Amino acid sequence: MALERRKANTIPVSWSQEDEKLLLSYLKKESFDAKFLKELFPNRTLPGIRSKVRKLRIKHDLFGESYRGQKEDFTSKVAQKIKPKSVFDAYAGAGHQTFKWIAIADIVYASEKMKSKLKQFEKTAKTNGFTKVDTGDCLWKLFKKENKQILFFIGDAVDAAADLKVNNLHIDLVDLDTCGSTLPILPTLLVLLKPKHIVITHGEFHSMRFKREDVLRRLFMHRDIGENPLPMNVDEMSKELDKAVKIAALRAHNETSDSFWLSLEDETWLGGRFHGMLRRYYKVSKPSATSDCINELSNS
């Protein structure tokens, strides 16, 4: 059955400063409650409220605040286990995970597409005792603390990774931490940076909960785009994402020998199984024979 284009059926209504302050005050204290917010703003559609919630959370660094401690604990756990010297934090945001990685690593390269996040990152850097060093017009902004260095790139993660590749900089670990999906970008980053470790946060669970069939069809490149992957429960989605990650890595290059095999080493739920996201740590190695890889994936 053909998909229908998603579109708004109502005229957009601008938010007053009073309503915005009311919503922000709620978000700073409570988790998202669709029923309550619809009662609080009866003249607004639920999609409109969700859109404003997302914008405010980004603007005020509230995304994932309820499970930020869980995420930081997992990051620190992985860092202590593998002790990476260099890390690429592809979606750094305000830098909460960046400064957990730098506690162990010597250098962290962080990228963030939203220019507004730089001030938040600078604030986090100052809180952690890092000083910003003037680098002029350089694409990378430098923060230092004793022998530790963080370089912050304002722009797309692929552009940042390409710059690291051109300058022949070694990366031990790549952190893909976003509220969306990083499945499409994964093969590119693997080929460019050739890390030994990958940590990935799966925001695709939001698409599953909101029944975004169109989004999941696009993201699950290992499946027939003409087939609806839904319905799926949490366990099925977890297995599907593991398979998607491993197949994306196996197909990253023309030759199997130049592609990658990812082994799931650890995982944690952020915010609970039925409301949050899954964060996973994979060890990266070279694939064995193509047939062995395909057999394992086919039987998983």
Question: What is the predicted role of each segment?
Answer:
Residues 39-42, 101-107, 123-128, 144, ...:
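Short, surface-exposed basic-aromatic patches at helix termini and helix-loop junctions that form
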Residues 157-173, 178-300:
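Class I S-adenosyl-L-methionine
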Residues 2-6, 46-104, 110-168:
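S-adenosyl-L-methionine
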Residues 2-61:
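Myb-family helix-turn-helix DNA-binding modules
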Residues 2-4, 40, 46, 57-61, ...:
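Structural alpha-beta junctions
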